[in-house]
Regions:
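Glycan-recognition and catalytic cores of secretory/periplasmic carbohydrate-active enzymes
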Residues: 1-440
Length: 440
């Protein structure tokens, strides 16, 4: 073994060790902080902010004045969120926490981590959209956007796939009939409640909710992945046919430079970091399941665009390459989390992403971890947004680092090294719902 290789392995081992300590500290923070939080949408989730945002979309000039106080607070006084709304539980965050703890179980064999994962799955069973027959999830607040208001507990095809993945991961580790039934129900929801809109002979976009008109790229990518997976799990060819049309919509609407606009409506033509990751993650997962030939070329162009346009001069994720508006922050935890996820999925096919992965993970460990164990949420133009938000970065970063830790454990095992031990700082933590979570 040459010295360069030894040095590389040693450096990676040190990085993995630091990730282990950071994950341990985060779990202890989660136990003391609780499983509800404010959100980056807290400024607009309440009645005052919601009306101001709706006015902005109807009358830009007057509305700009109405939302100005919230935008000012977002940029300079992030803790003011508590004046506009209250902490909430977010299903999409619970799904990420469930997956993160499942990764820790896979890495260490520590059964308490699987118990932690199951705790969050139990919470997901409670938080499903109550007015729908099938299992599905959305936001716990009214979401005002340019097309109107999406009411709380309206299912979102950009949320439900995470719950699907969380239950599938647990089912593969511990097959339970109840989880299989939930997975079947989620697949039926994605296939029937979410609508298709023909865009070409071979492609269809899909609705974001059961009642909108479609056109959002990442929505189609999410649904294509979910139904492709479900077609394999349940042997349902109908799911695969629906998925293939949504997949073709994504492939047919990739720009010549390799990017994807957010939507094809001619209005939301921005290109940002985490939505680009969402699209390419879905493509990578579909390719792993099917070997679809067209995906390889799309990913090649996508990775080239991504690497050349969605990183700043320091080689770190930047929010937009084509922004829809002025942004009040320089970097975002969510972008970094999704970057880590994408690099882990694609580094074998695109080796240049290995250096990106190491750089971003190192940067998170050095600059974004707080003394209490949580992560900073945003790097503002002046200072930091240190308000911990489960839906907006905390859960995603926990999952991505746990995924990194699990993949590192697999690599170590392949090299014949001993299995990773349980994470340090073994303690018992209590969730905000008084349910015991062990960390040993």
């Amino acid at each position: 073994m040459n010295n360069e290789y030894k040095s590389s392995v040693s450096g990676q081992s040190q990085l993995v060790s630091t990730v282990s300590r950071v994950l341990s500290s985060f779990v202890q923070w989660l136990g003391s902080y609780g499983e509800t939080s404010w959100d980056f949408q807290s400024f607009f989730a309440g009645p005052v902010g919601g009306r101001a945002k709706a006015l902005y979309y109807r009358h830009r000039l007057v509305g700009t004045a109405a939302v100005a106080p919230m935008i000012f607070c977002e940029a300079f006084l992030p803790s003011a969120r508590r004046l506009f709304h209250h902490p909430m539980r977010f299903p999409i965050a619970d799904a990420h926490y469930a997956m993160g703890f499942a990764f820790l179980y896979q890495a260490t064999g520590d059964v308490s981590q699987l118990e932690n994962s199951i705790h969050f799955l139990t919470e997901l069973e409670k938080s499903r959209c109550p007015e729908f027959k099938e299992y599905c999830w959305g936001y716990p607040f009214d979401w005002v956007w340019r097309g109107g208001t999406i009411n709380r507990e309206t299912p979102l095809i950009t949320t439900t796939p995470y719950e699907y993945e969380a239950f599938l991961q647990a089912f593969e580790l511990q097959p339970r009939d109840e989880w299989k039934l939930i997975l079947e129900s989620i697949a039926r929801h994605a296939a029937t409640d979410i609508k298709d809109f023909r865009t070409s002979e071979t492609a269809s976009s899909c609705s974001y909710t059961p009642s909108d008109e479609g056109g959002v790229i990442n929505a189609a990518a999410y649904r294509a992945f979910l139904l492709t997976s479900a077609s394999k799990v349940f042997g349902n060819e109908d799911y695969l046919r629906i998925a293939e049309r949504n997949l073709n919509f994504v492939l047919e609407n990739q720009n010549p430079d390799g990017s994807w606009f957010y939507a094809v409506d001619g209005v939301r033509d921005f290109v940002d970091h985490y939505h680009t990751c969402f699209v390419m993650k879905s493509l990578a997962k579909i390719h792993a399941l099917t070997g679809h030939a067209g995906i390889v070329g799309a990913l090649g162009k996508g990775v080239s665009y991504y690497s050349n346009n969605l990183f700043d001069s320091d080689g770190l994720p930047k929010p937009f390459s084509r922004a829809p508006r002025l942004t009040v922050y320089k970097r975002e935890l969510y972008d970094c989390a999704e970057c880590i996820n994408l690099c882990l999925l694609l580094r074998d096919r695109f080796p240049q992403l290995e250096a990106t992965l190491e750089k971003v993970v190192t940067h998170i460990l050095e600059a974004w971890t707080k003394p209490d164990g949580s992560f900073r949420s945003r790097k503002l133009h002046l200072g930091w947004d240190n308000v911990p938000m489960h839906r907006w970065g905390q859960s995603q970063m926990f999952r991505s680092l746990a995924f990194y830790f699990r993949e590192s454990a697999k690599t170590a095992e392949e090299r014949g090294e001993a299995r990773f031990h349980a994470l340090p700082h073994n303690k018992e933590i209590i969730s905000s719902s008084e349910q015991c979570l062990t960390f040993s």
